[in-house]
């Protein structure tokens, strides 16, 4: 009977140990309780993501957004700041720092200004206005601010209409009405994904290129990178992944979320410069050059394209 040399056995042991360490690094490192029944799982979600009061009256978010289509990708830097109760501001910059868009959401709706063209657009419905301008997330800036902060009360209905057990653990809760029609929770009561109908006002890059979308037009928003899985204190997901029809996707990587009290009114103002061309979106769509700022469908030099590979930020 022959035996492998000691050096070979030592190498095999080292490889096995490295594999075990890699598996351990990939597994969630949290001490949260797990739930095997849907009702306790849903209650854990409500206790953590619905019922707590907001930490402050406002916030300041720094994030990067990668919008990908099957043929291109566009990366921008995003700052979202202001009061949860509005007004809220969002500034969008190219990766090289060039300001692409300035937006303000308040009780009057959404106002957006594009400095390079000196053009402004407005709509009384902030959700419709944002989607006409190419923002991929299917809800208002306020709802986006809430979700980034780990608060879902403005989107998720109270009582599900049906419940499904998932083979991998966790549960899927379906709703017949509201912006969110499906909420998937993991076994810790944390949002894993949400689904809902896509507004007729938002068009994917394929649709803007003239390709029809067959079947249901739906969006799926996945949540990843919870800080407690890395041994940090529990907090909101730091990566939001939006999947859209025809292969479009948007990945929002949250770099920082800071609670802020009582923003000064002038800090949230959006004054248009003299000579800016203004256009209401109430009865006509935004021009393609405006909606391409986020999706990168226009001139790459203008839109801050960084040669990112589609799908590279999953």
Predicted regions and their residues:
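Bacterial N-terminal signal peptides
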Residues: 13-24
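C-terminal low-complexity, charged extensions that often adopt amphipathic alpha-helices
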Residues: 123-166, 278-299, 307-314
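An acidic-aromatic
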Residues: 87-143
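Hydrophobic lipid-interacting interfaces of membrane-associated proteins
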Residues: 64-70, 95-97, 108, 117, ...
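Edge/loop elements at the starts and ends of beta-strands within beta-rich repeat scaffolds
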Residues: 51-59, 71-74, 81-86, 166, ...
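N-terminal leader/targeting segments and the immediate start of mature chains
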Residues: 26-75, 283-314
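Gly/Pro-enriched, hydrophobic low-complexity segments
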Residues: 161-288
